[in-house]
């Protein structure tokens, strides 16, 4: 009954991944991001991650697998997803939703830390403000974006962009793969 739809969805997902893999710059950016994160951890820094909607879940997933575990047991790494409901509701109410991430970065970010901003469109105003706040703190910035990178294009030290112009879910599927690879590479770097 739905076999053609199922095959079509899986084929589109595979094609999106294949196109992403064909650009060596993506592979290089993932490696550089992992080394940047591990270097921050080794120097006493941390990563703050943020996103909206499904990307918010990805930001939480990233932090959870760094502080908890990925595939193997190892020490936890310093990662915070900006996801505290009381913070988000307070800042949204008192300042506006566009400040929910930047206020947190202003409060706990420091030089040597890293901000990971995740936005499938690259146009999330609250992440753009978080990037500005991170820059003011002397933090490094990594972004996971999609399409043409949107307004966030060129704003990060390292941008990992999925150039898919369809629905956001295809971009998110690549983002979660990138997140898992980042964690795997961070673990290898931390063993050095």
Curated annotation (Swiss-Prot):
PROSITE patterns: SIS
InterPro entries for the chain: GmhA/DiaA (IPR035461), Phosphoheptose_Isoase (IPR004515), SIS_dom (IPR001347), SIS_dom_sf (IPR046348), SIS_GmhA/DiaA_subfam (IPR050099)
UniProt superkingdom: Bacteria
CDD domains in the cross-refs: SIS_GmhA
Reactions this protein catalyses: 2 D-sedoheptulose 7-phosphate = D-glycero-alpha-D-manno-heptose 7-phosphate + D-glycero-beta-D-manno-heptose 7-phosphate
Domain SIS: from-to ranges: 37-192
Residues the entry annotates as binding substrate: 52-54, 65, 93-94, 119-121, 124, 172
Cofactor(s) named in the record: Zn(2+)
Localisation per UniProt entry: Cytoplasm
Pfam families reported for this sequence: SIS_2
Pathway where it operates: Carbohydrate biosynthesis; D-glycero-D-manno-heptose 7-phosphate biosynthesis; D-glycero-alpha-D-manno-heptose 7-phosphate and D-glycero-beta-D-manno-heptose 7-phosphate from sedoheptulose 7-phosphate: step 1/1
GO molecular function terms noted in the UniProt entry: carbohydrate derivative binding; D-sedoheptulose 7-phosphate isomerase activity; zinc ion binding
Cofactor note: Binds 1 zinc ion per subunit.
GO biological process, one term: D-glycero-D-manno-heptose 7-phosphate biosynthetic process
First-listed, main subcellular location of the protein, grouped into a coarse class: cytoplasm
Binding residues for Zn(2+): 61, 65, 172, 180
Biological role: Catalyzes the isomerization of sedoheptulose 7-phosphate in D-glycero-D-manno-heptose 7-phosphate.
Miscellaneous information on this protein: The reaction produces a racemic mixture of D-glycero-alpha-D-manno-heptose 7-phosphate and D-glycero-beta-D-manno-heptose 7-phosphate.
Protein name, UniProt field: Phosphoheptose isomerase
Source organism per UniProt: Proteus mirabilis (strain HI4320)
